[in-house]
Amino acid sequence: MTEPRMMRLGVFLSGSGGNMASWRHPSAVPDGAVNLKYFQGLTRKAEDAKLDFVFFGDGLYISEKSHPNFLVRFEPLTLLAALAMDTTNIGLAATLSTTYSDPYTVARQFSSVDHLSNGRAGWNIVTSPLEGSAANYNKPEHPQHDLRYRMAGEFVEITKGLWDSWEDDAFVRDKESGVFIDPEKLHRLDHKGEFFNVQGPLNISRSKQGSPVLIQAGSSEAGRGFASKVADAIFTGQATRADATAFYKDVKQRATSAGRNPSEVLILPGCGPIVGDTPEEAEAKYQEIANLVVIDDALNYLGRYFNDMDFSPYDLDAPFPELGDFGRNGWESTTDKIKQLAKDENLSLREMALRSTTPRNEFIGTPAQVANSMQAWFENGAADGFMLNNSVLPQGFNDFVD
């Protein structure tokens, strides 16, 4: 008998919340991004609420215009190791770049976290959209978008091979016979590829999962192709159910074409629920968040998608400027959507900046309204679950869970 399909839920824990001005909210913890006790409390709450996982993003470049939660934050795998000691069942996932890391180190790091957490680690595989990252890693320039995905494909192939360095029962550890390992169950990788040469084997035994859950976040053509071949779960950001349904269908078909079972490739759109006892209360909470955003911060937030572009010289109330292909080497799918939305709705620069900073979605309302919207996406081919990304933490998450 087929088991019933279950909605999967994770929560993106990003300091004071996803909104650029969230740290100013009365309920916010302004230093949340570097406050271990704060993250421990939120993670325990997520575990008690039976969520599947918590997630921590990362980036490798900042400027004075960056999101406050990005200006100062923990290195995420270190944080996962700490949270593993404080939780029992919930999955622990984090971002790590394939463009500015090496496969052997990444394989060790995630295998270690998987051991420490007793098989609860997840890796959000990114290729690093921020072009300024290159200068922090002794690189002359940021690789082109499609090249980064080619590198990522080989990178993940290597890490998966390294995680299979040892068979499950390779470590005998027999004191009487003096046999520590069975050498027949040790496998050296000897990978020689386009971008990497890695000998192996990995110097840690197979973890409980064998490998972490592999996650990918990207909606570009290259991102979809990559995710459909390697990801167990895909984070995506479609704003409407129609767009989410089209994405869902496309990626499931790609997974099938890649020889995979599409039901094992989970599509998890972002969901920013704002919950109130009445629709009016929920709307008031949205407006309270939106009113915290000043236009300069909104322009900075928008600019980060366009390689930290300075929009201040432009007329705020003129139509959104024509930018051509600018931004596509970083956030390709996101910048394409911004440009298309501005064109379709004839938005001014001011309107586009404010909308991008505090987007309105289908998940604002009473508990029943939000639950019904999520169920509609889940039951109609738009989602296998959701990544909760609350505008303000901890209030937004508490409202949703409670």
Name these PLM-found stretches.
Residues 1-87, 209-212:
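N-terminal beta1-alpha1-beta2 module of alpha/beta enzyme domains
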Residues 2-17, 146-209, 242-249, 253-378:
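An alpha-helical appendage that flanks or caps ligand/catalytic pockets
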Residues 7-11, 54-56, 90-96, 119-125, ...:
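Hydrophobic faces of well-ordered beta-strands that scaffold small-molecule active sites
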Residues 9, 46, 50, 83, ...:
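Conserved, mostly hydrophobic/aromatic
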Residues 21-37, 95-104, 140-142, 146, ...:
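Active-site mouth loops of central-metabolism enzymes
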Residues 32-46, 106, 216-226, 288, ...:
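Short, acidic/polar
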Residues 67-93, 151, 256-258, 397-402:
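Alpha-helix-loop-beta-strand connector modules within alpha/beta enzyme cores
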Residues 86, 91-137, 143-146, 151-155:
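Hydrophobic or amphipathic alpha-helical targeting/insertion segments
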